[in-house]
Amino acid sequence: MCARVTLTIDDIDEIAGMLDAELSPEDARRYKRRYNVAPSDTHWMLEYGADRRVLVPAKWGYVPTSPPGRARKPLINVRGEQVGSGHGFREAFASRRCAVVTDGFFEWNQRREPFWYHRPDGGLVLLGGLFQGAADAEREPRFTVLTTRPNKLISAIHDRMPVIVPAARIDDWLTAPPADAAALIAPAPEDTLIATPVSRRVNKVANDDAACLAPPEADAQGSLF
């Protein structure tokens, strides 16, 4: 399960430039660096609209269609193996794919020790996702993150990992026919990410500051005061 992400780059315009994406001034004013993004938070996704990439804020949690009177909980992750054949996601996978814009994500080992998975060069980590338009009472679309089987790095502590879309294939992910996009639902190459142990401060969703990425030793030092 992918349930926490980061986006710590200072400037949203810099991010939009990296992605060659359109960004409205109104949306740009809402940006702030995030060190512990959790489900139900508003975050940033890349979609394809009006013949170009667009960077927009969206809420984390995709609400599946359900019979009248039977509300379903928002889904933060969907297994990538399901989207091509499952009736609940086939249409979304065909026409509403997105990339969730991050520079890393967290996973925990059995001792609840957190690790931050990120690129060695500090670059963007684009997670394959699906989105749905804003409901009548909401101002933002919603998204979910697709998962796949883990690569060797992540399999040491978890049996799933998010789908990571290579920057060079982002247009294929956003616009290609479903069969072509499905080929990108696969474990990331081993050299894509590194794992950095970080502070248990990130274990609490209320904590969202640079101290979340401090080394574990900072926890022990903090306990002395």
Feature-to-residue mapping (PLM):
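Short linear sequence motif anchored by a di-proline
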Residues: 1-225
